[in-house]
Structure formats: C-alpha cells, structure tokens
Amino acid sequence: CHFSGKSQEVILADRDLYASEQVCLDMSRAVRRLLDGEPLAYVLGEWEFYGLPLRVTPDVLIPRDDTCAVAELAIRKALFLEQDPRILDLCCGSGCIGLAIASRVKDAKVTLADLSMEALAVAKENTGLNRLGGRVRCVQADATKKAPAFLGKYDMIVSNPPYVTGAEMQALPHSVKDFEPEMALYGGEDGLDFYRAIVENYTPALKKGGFVCFEFGMGQGDDVCRILEENGYAILERTRDYNDRERAVLAQYGRKED
C-alpha cells in the first residue's frame, strides 16, 4: 500500500491490479534497507503515535509505545489546568508528545523545543500534517543551558530527554545504535544529565505551582524523583507503560498563590 500509493481497500477490491516496475524497484530497495537492519519507520518515512500520523527521519527518534505513558500522564493533568494552558515539550524530537497533548487538550498552547534544527524541521512538518499550527509553535532551545527569556512561562514542561547510560549505549541493538540519533539517546554516564539540567535551567520557565512531566528509563524512577524533590518539587504520580514498566513521573513545583 505504501509504495503503490493505493489504499488496502482498493488493492483488495481490484485483483487485476499489478505493481509497476517503479513500485517493484522501490519495494526491493526497502527490503534491502530492512535486511541491513534499518528500522521500518525510517524506511517508510512515517509512523503513528497516539493516533497521529507522523513524519520520521533519522534526525529524530522513532516514537515508541512506551512514550504513550508520559503523553497520557501529561494529558490527564493538562485537561484540568486553567483555560489556555501553556505547555513546553522540551527535547521534542518529532514533536510526538506535544502534538498528542495539543490534539487532546483543545485549548492548549504548545511549544515544541529542541536543540537540533533538523529535528525541529520534522516537528514543524508534523505540526502541519496534523493541522495544529494554530496552537503549536516550534523553537530552538538547549535543555542544558538557561531557558531563553523569549519562551516565557509555562503551566507544564513535558520531556522525554536522552536517558540512555554509557553502559547501555554499548549494548543497544544495531537498529537503534547505528540508525537513531545519538544526541537523542545518550544521557550521560549515569543517564541522568538531562534531568539535572532541565530542573536547573527550566524551573524558572514554570509558572508558580507549575508541573513537570518526565519520561525515564528502566530503574531510573527513584533517581529522577530524588532530583526533582531535592529541587523543590513534590511528586504527584508515577506511572507505568504498556509493558508494565515504570516509565513516567508528574511533579509540581512550589505552590500556586491564592
């Protein structure tokens, strides 16, 4: 279906259809790429996350079902925030989390931020693909440096930052290690560098009583929560992914003024 440009229904309905020479060539190239270990999402150039069609390239991580945990946690909280909540998706990559939030929280104003201009180009394309341009903007920002003043203040910061440890990087499968962007994977020797940096640099970008929602790797939950608590956050909820692994945390900074 992907290579022919025809829907499954059309192909099944017309058994006299045949693949053109170009379609056969495209499929042959795709099979070779798959046999070389390249992920299917990159071969197709598209993937789905939280019911949204997304463009994906080797400049961004492939959205995974595990990440639905942080998206769902953020959405549940955002639905009960004040009108027109401002939400920052930091280290946004393809924009999958922020776009999922914008698609479900109809009055949310979402900023997709990443250091990589190539990733931001993909995020911007996905914003248009899902017709969310009226409430979503894409900006360049570095999670490891002070939050730029132009960002303003947010009700919530959500992030799936790089969290793979040094040891884990060496053990990643070929399809990840050799194809997905290292800068979106490696989180420092202990995998926690970006959590420390975001809490230090982006807490000032939160409104008083604002929320942070993080995805984290297996076994990192206690350490991520400790980093948050040591910096004035109260842990509100820890949640699991579809494989029953602890995957995300929601925390609140300070208390909202009366």
What are these regions (language model features)?
Residues 68-171:
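Conserved SAM/SAH cofactor-binding pocket of Class I
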Residues 189-253:
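Conserved Class I SAM-dependent methyltransferase catalytic core
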Residues 132, 180, 206-208:
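Helix-to-beta-strand junctions that scaffold the AdoMet/dcAdoMet cofactor pocket
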Residues 254-258:
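Flexible, glycine-/basic-rich loop-and-beta segments that form/coincide
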Residues 163-193:
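Mobile active-site "lid"/loop adjacent to the S-adenosyl-L-methionine
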Residues 2-76:
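Conserved AdoMet
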Residues 37, 67, 97, 123, ...:
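Residue-level signal for inorganic ion chemistry
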